[in-house]
Amino acid sequence: IRRDSIDKERYLIDIQDLNWIRVGNSHEWRIGIRREFWGVTETAHRVDILNQTDQVESFDGEDKLGQPMVNFSLSKDWGTLDVYALLGFRERTFAGELGRLRSPAVINTDLAQYESAADYHRTDFAIRWSQSYQDLDLAISHFSGTSREPEFRLMEHKGETTVVPFYGLIDQTGLEVLYILGGLAVKFEGISRSGQSSRFSAATAGFEYTQVGILGSRFDLGWLMEVNHDDRLPSSPIALGTRFTFNDLYDSQILSGVLWNEQSGETSVFVEASRRIRECCKLSLEAIYFNGGHAGYDGYRMLEYFDQDDFLRFEFIYYIGN
C-alpha cells in the first residue's frame, strides 16, 4: 500500500508476491502473483520484461509491480526451461503534475491505448532456457505480447491536447551471459525486439572485478564498468562504479557510480546503500544527482528533463513474522 501527500498518481495497492507452488521430481508449478527478475548487468536491465516497472518508486527501473502468472519450470541435465503465461497487463506508473521525477508533459494514464483488441486483458507468453557450465552462466529468452515499455502519443481530450501511453505488441528475444574468472565477472545482456515501429537491438556489456579482503580487512571492494548501446539512440552512456561490501552479519553494502554520455556530456551520479537491523528490519538509501551536460550541445539529451531534479529516498522495512 502506498500513499502520497502531494501526488495522487503515486497511490498504489499492489500484491507483489503471492503464489501456490507444487514441486515434483524435476519440475515445479508456480501459480499466482510474482515478481521475477531476468538479467546480469547493473546499469540497464535489457531482458527483464515479465513485470511492469513501478516508475514513480525509483528512477533505475528495478522496482516492479506484481504480475499474475502461471509458470512451469523443468530442470534437466541440459538446463532449466521456464514457460510463462502472463495473465492480464499492468500499466506503467507515471508521476502526476505535482510529482517528481517526471517529463515536462504529464502522462494521462486514464486514456492509455493498446494495440491489442483485448486491451489489458490479453494473456502474454514467455519462455526462458538457462544453464550453468562451471564458470559460465547462459540464458536465452523470448517474450511475445504487450510491451511493458510504452510509446507516447498526442490526443485531443475535452478540448485539450494530452499525452497518453500506447502499449504495442512486440516480440523480444534476449541473451544473458555471465562468466566468472577468479575475482573477475564478465557480464552481457542484449535484446532484439520487433513490433515498435521497426526492429531494433540494445545491449549492455561490462565487467566487475572484486578485491577480496582489501588491506587485510574483511571488506571487499568491487570495480565495475559497463557500456550501453541502443539502436534507437544516437549515443549511450558509459557506467563506472564501485561496490563496497562489509561482509558483516547484517549484509551491509554500498554501490556507487556515475553514468556519463561522452557526446552530450550528461552525467548522473548514484549511490545505493543497504543494511539489515537484526533479523526484523532493513534500512536502505538511494540517491541520484543529474547534470545536464554541455551547454552548447544541441543534439539528443537522455537526461534533459531531469536537469533541475535530483532524487533521494530513505527506506525502512519491517518484516512481519520476525
Predicted regions and their residues:
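Transmembrane beta-barrel strands of outer-membrane/channel proteins
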Residues: 1, 31-35, 83-87, 140-144, ...
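Residues that define the transmembrane beta-barrel architecture of outer-membrane proteins
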Residues: 11-16, 23-25, 64-68, 75, ...
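Outer-membrane beta-barrel "beta-signal"
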Residues: 207, 306-322
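Outer membrane beta-barrel
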Residues: 1-101, 134, 288, 292
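Residue-level signature of outer-membrane beta-barrel architecture
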Residues: 21-24, 33, 73-76, 130-133, ...
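Detector for outer-membrane/organellar transmembrane beta-barrel domains
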Residues: 181-262
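Repeated loop/turn-to-beta-strand initiation elements of outer-membrane beta-barrel proteins
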Residues: 26-29, 78-81, 135-138, 183-187, ...
